[in-house]
Amino acid sequence: TPVMANEFSFSFEWGDIPLCTSGHPNIVKNPKFVLSNVPEHTKVISFRLKDLDAPSYDHGGGKITYSGNNEIEPGAFTYKSPCPPGGSHRYVWTATAKEKDSFFGGTIGKAKAMKLYPNK
C-alpha cells in the first residue's frame, strides 16, 4: 500500500546478519531502521518481526525510547533472525509508536515494512 503524506513509516536493511536458511534462527542485533513522520508525543517505539510465510513462529523484537532520532542503529535490541528453510520468505517489521511505556494503551501510530529473506 502506498504511504500517504505525513504518515508514520520506516525502512530497514537486513545488514550484516549471518546468512541463515536452516530453519534455526540466530539471535542477532536489530537492523538499522530509518523512521519518517513519527507521531508527535511518541516516547517509545516497539518493533516486532513476523514471517508472513510461517506466521506462528515468534521472531520477537524489542523497544526503544524515542527522543527524536529517526535512525535506529543496530544493537538497540536483539531478535531471532530470519532463517527460512527452503527458499525466501516474506518478513514484516511492525513499529508501534506509543506516548507512554505501557503494554496497554497509549498507541498513537503503527507502521509496517516488508522485505524478502534471503532477498535473492
Regions found by a protein language model. Name each.
Residues 2-120:
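N-terminus-centered regions that define maturation/targeting leaders and the start
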